[in-house]
C-alpha cells in the first residue's frame, strides 16, 4: 500500500441504474415487491405459528425459510430503495460490514434449510412408516438451529478476514448492496487469502447442500417411479415440486456467479444474479409453497373466517 494512500471509511453503491429517469419506476416496482414479500412471508409464519395442525416438521421448516427470506429482503431492499433518491448513495464501512454479515448469515442458513427440507421429503416419501419416528419436531428444531449456527459461523469467518483489509483504491461498489466479491475488488490489501476462504468455505457449503439435495431427490425419484398408484405418484410429485422449484431458483444464479470468469464485463450480470436471490426469490417462495398446498390454503381460510 502506498504511504500517502487515504484509507476509505465510506463507499458508494452504484445501484441498478445510472439514469435518473428510471429511479421512480424502479423504486415503485421494488417497493411493491418488498411489501408483497413481507406480507406473504409474515402471513405464512403467522399461519404456521397459530395453527396447531401445521406444527409438524414440513411446516416448521417452511416457517423458518419464510423468516430467512424476510430477513434477506429486509437487509438489502430498504437501503436499495433509499438509494434511488439519495444523491450520494453512501454507505459507511461499518454499515457495509454489518449488512454483509447479516446477509451472509441469512443466505448460508437458507442453503442448509433447503438441504434439511430435502432430507425431510426423502424420509416422508421413501420411509413413510418411519417418518413420525425419524423426523420428530425435536429433530426438526435441532436441524433448524444447526442451520442458523452454521450461518453465523460462516459469516464470522468471512467477517474476520474482511476486517484485516484496507480500502484506498476506490470507494465505488458496483452493486446495490455490500457483497464480499465487490469488497474484495476494491481493497488495496492482498486479497488472495480472502478469495481462498471464499472458495473453501462457501464452495464446501454449496457442494454439501447441493449434494444432499441431489441425493435425496434422486432416491425420491426412484421411489416414486416404483409406485404403482397414479394417485401416489401425483401426490409425491406435488409434495416435492414446490421445493425443487425453490431450490432451482435459488441455486441457479448462485452457481452461475461462482463458475463464470471474473471480468469487468460481468459486473452487471452479477448484479442481476444478486437481484434474483435477494429480491425475487423471497417474494416467490411463499407463493410457490402456498398456492398448491391444500393445508396452507385451508389454514388461511380458517384464519380469515375467524378474524374477518
UniProtKB/Swiss-Prot annotation:
GO terms for biological process: G protein-coupled receptor signaling pathway; sensory perception of smell. It is found in: Cell membrane. Keywords: Cell membrane, Disulfide bond, G-protein coupled receptor, Glycoprotein, Membrane, Olfaction, Receptor, Sensory transduction, Transducer, Transmembrane, Transmembrane helix. Glycans are attached at residue 4. It is a multi-pass membrane protein. Disulfide bonds join 96-188. Residues 49-55, 114-143, 219-238, 292-308 are cytoplasmic. GO terms for cellular component: membrane; plasma membrane. Residues 1-27, 77-92, 165-197, 260-270 are extracellular. It comes from the Eukaryota. Gene3D superfamilies: Rhodopsin 7-helix transmembrane proteins. GO terms for molecular function: G protein-coupled receptor activity; olfactory receptor activity. Potential odorant receptor. Belongs to the G-protein coupled receptor 1 family. This is Olfactory receptor 5H19. It comes from Mus musculus. The gene is Or5h19.
